[in-house]
């Protein structure tokens, strides 16, 4: 069995676009993946056809280690764009393998390790501006069954917080904590905004809210700084979504710079490399919680990884807070119920692209909203129905 055809599909999802891909074998089996890289989807699509396609056509889909390892070796300059294209292909290969073996992908990755897959909500704060708004949105999310919520309370801060910015952030966190009570987990997103000193000071002020973790308190590529911040604070630290290579994750884990590793399966090489990262983390008693802020095919890959990974902790969930047509982009897929994920027992990933719905939402060029000016907060806190 060889890969005979390579296709890509761009579709809009409000503020961003999703890039799906499909591989077809000479025996007629198909596999789908996702290569969405926020606000760079057309660039990734070009890489898919001008660089990846020639390296995947004619290859045996079962030869994942050789095929994907060879592409990672051959990329030379590296980076998120090309690794996203490679990652999407890797997931599509697993989809083909699962269908060929008549097994869901998670069973090929080690089998079931968990009875259920807890989710934490992200994007739940649509339309919120004030502490009262955040309180109301938080209660709505908990009413859907979520037992953990993530949000960035820091506005447009960069490196340091003024006293006013610090107080405003703490007021937002306090409002959400009061609204949901002590039994709901809060993940505080920093987006790598702060200097090490300001991050430590801010995390100490957050201790009274007992967050599950503080995410990217400093720039995540500065792994030494992450480790230093972790040593000086009592709160758990999470990071990893903006790391891409096995060497990056080895350093992150060996320095014990985090308590939770957040690899993004869509950007770090796919499922097999993510399993290797999780195994390294397990040796250090570090848990994993995959980042996933893109579409339904990427989420499906995460869930197969989660179910088969012993040190999995909790899965990020935008699914119920995305555009209304999100789940219609694929067939056979509605994976969340009352704040937890579940997987169908279908072969492969368990879903297929719906080309009709995809074509109804064509690509729209959007500009990346900088996290350090007012546009990002305005855009990301719009209600999805307004997009």
How should each PLM-predicted stretch be described?
Residues 1-32, 36-37, 320-327, 380-382:
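Structured beta-strand/loop patches that form or line metal/cofactor-binding pockets in enzymes
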Residues 50, 66, 204, 210, ...:
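Shared catalytic-loop signature of beta/alpha-barrel
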Residues 90-127:
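Glycine-rich, aromatic-flanked loop segments that form ligand/cofactor-binding clefts
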Residues 349-387:
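Extended hydrophobic packing segments that form well-structured cores
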Residues 116, 120, 124-233:
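Metal-dependent enolase-superfamily TIM-barrel catalytic cores that perform enediolate-based chemistry
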């Amino acid at each position: 069995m060889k890969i005979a055809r390579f296709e890509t599909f761009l579709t809009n999802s409000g503020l961003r676009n999703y890039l799906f891909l499909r591989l077809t074998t000479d025996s007629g089996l198909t596999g789908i993946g996702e290569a969405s890289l926020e606000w760079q989807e057309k660039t990734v699509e070009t890489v898919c056809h001008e660089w990846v396609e020639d390296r995947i056509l004619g290859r045996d889909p079962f030869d994942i280690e050789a095929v994907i390892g060879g592409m990672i070796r051959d990329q030379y300059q590296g980076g998120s764009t090309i690794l996203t294209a490679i990652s999407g292909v890797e997931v599509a290969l697993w989809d083909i393998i699962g269908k060929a073996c008549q097994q869901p992908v998670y069973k090929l990755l080690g089998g079931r390790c968990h009875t259920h897959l807890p989710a934490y909500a992200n994007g739940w704060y649509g339309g919120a501006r004030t502490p009262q708004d955040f309180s109301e949105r938080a209660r709505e999310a908990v009413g859907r069954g979520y037992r953990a919520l993530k949000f960035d309370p820091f506005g447009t801060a960069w490196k340091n917080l003024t006293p006013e910015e610090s107080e405003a952030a703490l007021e937002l966190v306090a409002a959400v904590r009061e609204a949901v009570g002590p039994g709901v987990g809060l993940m505080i997103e920093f987006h790598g905004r702060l200097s090490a000193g300001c991050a430590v000071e801010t995390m100490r002020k957050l201790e009274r809210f007992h967050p599950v973790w503080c995410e990217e308190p400093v720039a995540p590529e500065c792994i030494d700084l992450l480790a230093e911040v972790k040593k000086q604070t009592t709160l758990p630290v999470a990071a990893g979504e903006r790391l891409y290579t096995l060497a990056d994750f080895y350093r992150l884990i060996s320095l014990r710079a985090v308590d939770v590793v957040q690899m993004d399966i869509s950007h770090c090489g796919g499922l097999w490399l993510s399993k290797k990262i999780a195994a390294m983390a397990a040796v250090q008693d570090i848990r994993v919680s995959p980042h996933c802020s893109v579409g339904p095919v990427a989420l499906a890959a995460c869930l197969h990884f989660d179910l088969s990974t012993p040190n999995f902790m909790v899965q990020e969930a935008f699914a119920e807070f995305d555009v209304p047509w999100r789940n219609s982009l694929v067939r056979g897929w509605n994976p969340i119920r009352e704040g937890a994920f579940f997987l169908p027992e279908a072969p492969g990933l368990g879903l297929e692209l719906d080309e009709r719905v995809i074509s109804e939402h064509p690509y729209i060029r959007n500009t990346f909203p900088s996290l350090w000016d007012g546009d990002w907060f305005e855009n990301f806190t719009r209600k999805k129905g307004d997009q």
